[in-house]
Structure formats: C-alpha cells, structure tokens
Amino acid sequence: MRVYDAKVNHMTNPMGFFMDGVSFSWKVDEARGKAQKAARVRVAADEKMQEILFDSGMDEQADSLAYPVELALEPRTRYFWQVTVLSDAGEEADSEVQWFETSKMSEEWTGKWLTCDNTEKRHPIFSKEIAPAKEVAKARLYVTGLGLYEAYIDGKKVGDEYLTPYSNNYNRWVQYQTYDITDQIAGGGKLSILLGNGWYKGRFGFSAFEDKGYYGNEWKVIADVVLTYTDGTEEVIGTDESWTVTRSRIMFSNLYDGEQIDATAPELPAEEPTVCDAPKGRLEARRSLPVVAHEHIKPVELIHTPAGEQVFDMGQNFAGIFTFRVKEPAGTKIHIQTGEVLQKGDFYNENLRSAKSEYIYISDGNETVIRPHFTYYGY
C-alpha cells in the first residue's frame, strides 16, 4: 500500500500562505483493502518527526479529502507532518514527511512602504546590498510590490513565479509572497525589486481609467529579509531610506497593450526612495496559487502571409509569454503582435479591439535572451 499526494490545505509543501486553519489530505493506492479504516496524522517541529507537536492517534473518522487539525501556529515557522493510513485489510503505510511554513502572520513589518518619482515612465528598481554578519542557516524574503514585481539577487530571479502579487481588490487587501533565498544570499548579494504596472497601476477596465491607475498611480514596494544565523540569532533588513532606486530599460508595460523595452536607453542617476503611505488594502499573506510556466511550446510553422508578414503558428491556443534570442544591430526595433486567427491568410487581431497586445524591443547590439516581464498574451 502506498500513501501519496499528501497536502496541506490542498497544497504541496506551501510556504507563506494565509492560514486561518490547517487541513490535511492524502491519497492511497496499491492496496489490497477497499477502503481506509483509520488514519493518524502527526505534526512535528523537526523533519525526523521526533519533536511531536500534535498526534491524532489512529482516528477512524479521519477524512482523507480534508482532515482539519487545530494547531497553535507560530509566525515564520516550518512544521513537518506525516500521515499513517490503516486499510480495512489490515495494511499500514506512511506517507513521506511533508512540510508547511507559516507567513509573518500578525508579526509587525520592519520594512516601510517605499515609492519613487512616478513621473519617470521607466520602470523602477529598488535595491539593497545584503551583507550577512554571520554564517546563514536560512534566509527568507517577504515582499510585495505594486502594481507587479519581480525580485532578483545579483541579477538572478528569485523564484519561478510570474505576475506577482497577482490580481485582487487592492483596496481591500494586498498579498505578499515568501521566498526561500538561503542559497542565493548566504554569501551576500544585491537584492533588487523591479516594479511594473499590472492591474493596480495603469490601464485596466473601461476607458475612463485608461489615463490613470484603477487602484493607484504610484509604484510601491515593501520587503523584509530575515536572516537566521547558525547561532540562532536573527537579523531583519527591511525597505527603508537606505535603499536606492535605479531605472530599468522597461519603458512601458500593460496587461492589455504589452511591453516595450529599449536596451539602448542610457543609465540614469540613482535616486533616493521616498517613504510613502501604505495602499488602502490590508497587507496580508498570499492566498493566490503560484503562476508558473507549465509548458514550453515551440512553433509548428512559420507562415509568410500575403501581406508580407511573418507569423509563427504555435499549434494551439493558450495564455502565456514568449522568450527569444536576439542579436541585431544597435537600434533595431523588433515588433511582435499576438493574435488567435488568420483572416484571408493574413494576421488578424482586430477582435482585441483597443488592446495592442504587442511587444517592442529595441536592440543594443548585444546577443541576449529576452521575455516580457509584466504582461501576458492570449494567442
């Protein structure tokens, strides 16, 4: 008998999610028996399951679809758990040890909400050098940015999610995400948070809101880096006036209209960030599941249309982004549009109405792999 697909609140090893309760679930196969007779759930403070915090004992009422357990959870804490299942044929099997890690919960933030000069259209990057004082046992980044954000350490993206912190009513609540950055920051490094417009800032909804943000018109960011050292002490580095603001080469981003990058744009002098008011919505641990790349699809055909266009046929309809390698002379403009059908053999996207659904890249002459950061396309 095998116990598998063990989840917490229907998620596998969730980190930093909002939890107003804890529920466990699991599946069983390869069993002689026809049904589960009982199950035992144990929760521990260690992966070896020796420091037991909760033990249900063999419970004949345990529901494998959702078994709620009352736990006094602590903020920023990883818990380990395991389920043992007894079948009606007398078989017994354990799941693999799983874990879940709590968010900041009600803990106060060290970081302050920061903004910058919002009249400059080039998308901002908020940065801070992180220099651990001792040997790092673990490191966590708690962060959100409005409208959208991507975090980097020494130029390498943190996590594999896109379009964070996702779409919700920002006037009511703003989600923050939690990342394990232990390996990336253990030796120190530069933490950078790139902001885009998204649903919060920029065109969203009906035409009355095209010239201003639906929820707000300021870029905003808040973050706490929590370094836990091997001696058990902690250091918290939050967003404050000591951070710096530089400008990316993203000139424009919008969920409807796409993104524009000018790699030839000159570097601008660093700016000082400004401490700003928090957004209207309460800052709360994430509820949205990660948006990640589930599949990489290659074009099945390059079509040369009667109008002289070059159209890549992806072979199916989907929502996503694209990546491509470019090496063109400096100043070369690459213009990509997306659509779902051809009309009379030519590219057609007038069904998108006013949405431009495009990507514009101006090359600086260097070979690079590029992708959109703060938009996605249906094509």
Give the predicted meaning of each segment:
Residues 1-78, 82-379:
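Extracellular/oxidizing-compartment recognition motifs
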